Swiss-Prot record:
It is found in: Cytoplasm. PANTHER family: 60 KDA HEAT SHOCK PROTEIN, MITOCHONDRIAL. Its EC number is 5.6.1.7. It comes from the Bacteria. One of its GO terms (molecular function) is ATP-dependent protein folding chaperone. It catalyses: ATP + H2O + a folded polypeptide = ADP + phosphate + an unfolded polypeptide. Gene3D superfamilies: GroEL, GroEL-like equatorial domain, TCP-1-like chaperonin intermediate domain. The gene is groEL. This is Chaperonin GroEL. Forms a cylinder of 14 subunits composed of two heptameric rings stacked back-to-back. Interacts with the co-chaperonin GroES. GO terms for cellular component: cytoplasm. Keywords: ATP-binding, Chaperone, Cytoplasm, Isomerase, Nucleotide-binding. Residues 533-546 have a biased composition (Gly residues). It comes from Leptospira borgpetersenii serovar Hardjo-bovis (strain JB197).
């Protein structure tokens, strides 16, 4: 296919037009008084959003060169969203400013590579300034503040996320689902839950709710099928003598083994529930090991030379309570050694750091949560489907921002931290075009506060100049429209979000500034229609065939 090749100024100018088209659509959403963007969908109702990355993802431009510029800035918002979960609009605004200011200087004759070096040095200084201002999150109120701001100043969402994190801990899993009602609620599953229910309904202890609840049971963990009764009879007798219930977790329980368990349970000789092991393959082995460590038992594995008929009570796990329904099993307060559980948690954290697969990371995170504290589910409710989708996106944003805040701490929000980072950039001793590169970053750092203020209906330049004279954490609160200590007022951002936004914006900005040639596919001309010249009477001679 033939290609269009553009050079120098022509190439950069077209890229810039694409950058501005995308950024101008995204930046109206910034701040507490940011506006909505309505996105048309081919099917169903339009999407209404104030989430920068959602807007960016929808934009495809007709002109191939402009679209390249837009897609490069889209990469800024998606990368920031992947790393920090929020800050996508801020990243887009910073990128737009860096590219616009940078291209002015390149057109005026500045060396793009020297500009890039200056930009990189300025960003390093600004990031260090952000890190120094960061304060570790100490309490539930700080978490609620971060979550509320990320959810567009929705205190209800902020408090729900703070409650969830308080209950499951910072390593716990918090998931977001659509509710069946208009209420937004929080459900917390304490202990370890996995998605396998009882093998037979005859094992339930409460026929009305169809749930088996066993108090202080022994837990047999076996990695193969159990089908022969002689393998199991020995351990069933020992558990019955101890007067305790038994939970069997194995690949499968079938045949005479299952029949014996059901008959003895119905006769009340022993209270026993059999459950299939969770997961598949290597993940199943790892999850069985997790359960064993949580309950203080051992995985009875023939790979290790162990036999089911030789199992003793000391090899079985223990827990305060186990509840099993048709679909889920929950182990509450396993009696494993704290030291061993912490060791296992450390091992899983190391695996999370080492893995490159997002799927593996997600599954490891789930295992970690089940060992560390539990799982919380936020059910998002709303009056209409359009509102629910918009609200769910805000909750997911807020959740990601909160995790980022727990990781690297919080800084004053409202664009103030980036503005204050100007001092670190100004202190750099650079010369020539490198100094110009640093000035580009210096100017860009005030752009978010300018846009937040513009969206609130005020003159951004006036607020920016006034903010530069303020000391400490005092800044402009665009929600209440007053000057105050932003941290005390709860206007805070996760340091990781602010840092990632700046680094990603500078990365793409530098790439566009140092672009000299663009290559795009030539638009294909429509091929002539071979039937076009035949006219209506072209096949008239066929009339006699009737």
């Amino acid at each position: 296919m033939a290609k269009d090749i553009e050079y120098n100024e022509t190439a950069r100018r077209k890229l810039l037009e694409g950058v501005n088209k995308l950024a101008n659509a995204v930046k109206v959403t910034l701040g507490p008084k940011g506006r909505n963007v309505v996105i048309d969908k081919k099917f169903g109702a339009p999407t209404i959003t104030k989430d920068g990355v959602t807007v960016a993802k929808e934009i495809e431009l007709e002109d191939a060169l402009e679209n390249m510029g837009a897609q490069m800035v889209k990469e800024v918002s998606t990368k920031t969203n992947d790393v920090a979960g929020d800050g996508t609009t801020t990243a887009t605004i910073l990128a737009q400013s860096i590219i616009n200011e940078g291209l002015k200087n390149v057109t005026a004759g500045a060396n793009p590579m020297s500009l890039k070096r200056g930009i990189d040095k300025a960003v390093t200084a600004a990031v260090e300034s952000i890190r120094k201002r960061a304060v570790k999150i100490e309490n539930k109120k700080d978490i609620a503040n971060v979550a509320s701001i990320s959810a567009n100043n929705d205190d209800t969402i902020g408090n729900l996320i703070a409650d969830a994190m308080d209950k499951v801990g910072k390593d716990g899993v918090i998931t977001v689902e659509e509710a069946k009602s208009i209420e937004t609620t929080l459900d917390v599953v304490e202990g370890m839950q996995f998605d396998r229910g009882y093998i037979s309904p005859y094992m339930v202890t409460d026929a009305e709710s169809m749930v088996a609840t066993l108090s202080d049971p022994y837990i047999l963990i076996y990695d193969k099928k159990i089908s022969s009764m002689k393998d199991l009879i020995h351990i069933l007798e020992k558990v019955a003598q101890a007067g305790k219930p038994l939970v069997i977790i194995s690949e499968e329980v079938e045949g005479e083994a299952l029949a014996t368990i059901v008959v003895n349970t119905l006769r009340k000789t022993i209270s026993c529930v059999a459950v299939k092991a969770p997961g598949f393959g290597d993940r199943r082995k790892a999850m069985l090991e997790d359960i064993a460590i949580l309950t203080g038992g051992q995985v009875i594995s023939e790979d290790l030379g162990m036999k089911l008929e030789n199992t003793t009570l000391q090899m079985l796990g223990r827990a305060n309570k186990v509840t099993v329904d048709k679909e889920n099993t929950t182990i509450i307060e396993g009696k494993g050694q704290t030291k061993e559980i912490q060791g296992r948690i450390g091992q899983i954290k190391k695996q999370i750091e080492d893995t490159t697969s997002e799927y593996d990371k997600e599954k490891l995170q789930e295992r970690l949560a089940k060992l560390a504290g539990g799982v919380a589910v936020i059910h998002v409710g709303a009056a209409t489907e359009v509102e629910m989708k918009e609200k769910k996106a805000r909750v997911e944003d807020a959740l990601s921002a909160t995790r980022a805040a727990v990781e690297e701490g919080i800084v004053p929000g409202g664009g103030l931290t980036l503005l204050k980072a100007q001092e670190a950039v100004a202190a750099l001793k650079l010369e020539g075009d490198e100094a110009t590169g640093a000035k580009i970053i210096f100017r860009s750092l005030e752009e978010p506060i300018r846009m937040i203020t513009n969206n609130a209906g005020l003159e951004g330049s006036v607020i920016v100049e006034h903010a530069k004279t303020k000391k400490g954490n005092e800044g402009f609160n665009a929600l209440s429209m007053v000057w105050e200590d932003l941290v005390s007022a709860g206007v805070v951002d996760p340091a990781k979000v602010v840092r990632s936004a700046l680094q990603n914006a500078a990365s793409i900005g530098s790439m566009i500034l140092t672009t000299e040639v663009t290559i795009t596919d030539k638009p294909e001309k429509d091929a002539p229609n071979p039937m076009a010249g035949m006219g209506g009477g072209g096949m008239g001679g066929m009339g006699g065939m009737m």
